[in-house]
Amino acid sequence: MNRNCASPEEGGTTEQLVKEASDIVERDGFENKKKPPTLKLEHVEVVGEKSPTPATVYDLFKKYKKPDIVTNSNGDDMNVGFDQLSSDEKNGFLRKLQMLTVSSRKSVKVVGESTPSSAGRLLKKFAPSRKPTEKISVDEPPSRFNFFGRSTKKLSDSDRPSSLPKKKSARRLLFGKEEQKPEPEVVKNRVLPAMTSQQSAKGAPIPINKPYRYQGPRGSLETPTDSPAKISSNSSSSSPIPPVPTRNHFTSMNEESPSKKRTFSRQGLSNRDNLSNGSWHGELPPRDYTSPTFSRKIFVGGVPWDITEAALKDSFGEFGSCAVEWPGQEARYRSGQSNIAPLTNLRNQSKYAGQAATGYVYMIFEDERAVASLLHECSQEIGGAGEWYFKIRAQRSKSTEIRQVQIIPWVTSDSMFCEDESLLETGIEPKRTVFVGALHGMMTAQVLHWIMEDCFGSVECVQLDTDKFKYPIGSGRVTFREHGAYFKAIEMGYLHVHTSKFRKRVQIDPFLESTSCMVCTTESAQCFCRNRNCFKYYCHTCWAIDHGKDNADDVHVPVIVPSSASKAYAGPHRRPHLTSNSLSKSHGCSTNNQLSHVLSPGFPMIVGGPSQTLSALYGYIQNNQQMMLTPAVYETPMTPPSNESNAKRRSFTEFQNPAIFFNPSSMMTPQKSATCSETPVPAFFTNSAAFLTPNSNYYGSPNHSSSNISQSPQQYYGANLYYGYMPPQVAYDGSTNGSKLSPIHVPHIPNYQ
């Protein structure tokens, strides 16, 4: 009991004693809690480095404290008096303070951090740590891993390499070196921004996503520098294969909303400011679609030259009923006419004379879902422009060969591209529209829109022509917003498109329509002058008056208005079977079918007569159109080389009506605008061709009935088919001695349109 407490003998009551005792206990407990226990430290003399190292910073401050320094009465702060220390004391104080506060081996404990529990320490002991472990003694016993070139010895920080190479996955897209982050969540969050920034820096095209409203075709698949027997392209790549063979699953992960406006990052090397050579260089963007609608017709490239129709149907028939369409169907028509002109084609000398040795075919399915199922079984490459690859079986004499072929489907939404949807209702402006021909099969309407806009100016609308299967035929129309861009494209006349997949020479001509002569306004227009000074529709009479005095240096070449030379044919007389391989040798059998396949689908055809006094005509004859003219056959070459004398040249038979002349044998056809270095006559190229002669009252017609025969001869351009079309030979009867030819008269067909 404390002596301050009152005893009962001194007169204190029991209650007072208890109260005083409780107050003393509470006061003693409060004082014990307030005052920390005193640290018992040995006296250490300040002798520099020989002094023992203090345990804490508090001890260090207490060690260097001067007795004459006034401290805070509360004891919270301690003034060492650093300014009163000697230089040795300052250096020793700072060195010891650094040893206590900064340690390379011990981490500083954060204020408020809880002490790890026993479970946490156990987890930290067995869980893999990101920090390098301590170095193990070299004198450890040998391990079984040493026999295989491995050691259980762990590396220290100095022995460990700074950056170890990572394994690169074959399916992973690498966008440069990423900054290594210790936390995987941070690295994961950087993937999408890195992809976006890197693709923008490289100028990679953004995937094209088309709305459903567009209907689309594909162009011709021949390259102008190659023969028709070569396929258009062997190199291709495309985006990953969809998991389900339904059109709803042909969607890319990087796909945008169809309603969102898409841009195209061009990689072109030439633009409208660098178009002096008439070339455009660039890359096709990858194509991704949302719920595409495929054409029932597909392109199959890289097929063996001796592939049979049965082998193709056997390979593709598992996806649905299909038929084979040979390109151009030339060989099937030639096969029945070997008695007229012997052919040197290797295919026609073999048992496979019923097929065309072109290296590609077209497969036509009954249902578009069969195309989706086929694409599900195809392989692709990342970043392609719409090519797929499929393996077919080709039967050989002693074995079966597995051949990988190229599959190019066509999405019907690629036939039209208009930035302004109101044009679909109001229609396009013909006076700002050009006709483009010889388009490549990978050029969609949107791709053509970008190319023409990049070269000439703002484009309003692009439409591509298709066949009855909604498959492209290689031609289209481009409408510009301004007349300046329109005239610039017309004056250029052609455009060389260069990509890593193909090179194509695209022909550009004014889009012609049925109208009257702009001079007399009474006769219907038969031709159009594309020269900038004229740029009018003419009838034959007005053309002879306005252009009868043209000199050889300034020749205006007229463009034939298609409606004046041909009309659209509905097709009731077309061949009902896609693979029919015979042509009648008789005179009057299936003449209409012969003529319906003479015309090249969408290829530009220059037509004219081989007369020195005949001015050149050229124009386009559309697909599924038939000539409303009387044909005739001419045996010998129509345009011999320039070194031949005029005596060897044979003239046309004089007809009072327009006529088409076919040359069964190979002839020398001059390339338009290609001049020879030795003579002013254009360079010649071997090809077969068809010629259209004008009316008898036209200037320079074969019968020389025109009053303009006294005019000087003008340069003649023969048929130019750009290596993409070999017309079938037409059966005829009668002698070809001299200049006497027997024409084949076309029976009257009442259902011409």
From Swiss-Prot:
Biased composition (Basic and acidic residues): 131-142, 175-188
InterPro entries: CEBP_ZZ, CEBP_ZZ_sf, CPEB, CPEB1_RRM1, Nucleotide-bd_a/b_plait_sf, RBD_domain_sf, RRM_dom
GO terms under biological process: negative regulation of cytoplasmic translation
Cellular compartments per GO CC: cytoplasm; neuron projection; nucleus; synapse
Keyword list, A-Z: RNA-binding
Record carries keyword RNA-binding: yes
Record domain RRM: where: 298-320
RNA-binding found in the keyword field: yes
Compositionally biased spans, kind Low complexity: 227-239
Biased composition (Polar residues): 265-279, 578-589
GO molecular function, one term: mRNA regulatory element binding translation repressor activity
Name of the molecule in the record: Cytoplasmic polyadenylation element-binding protein 3
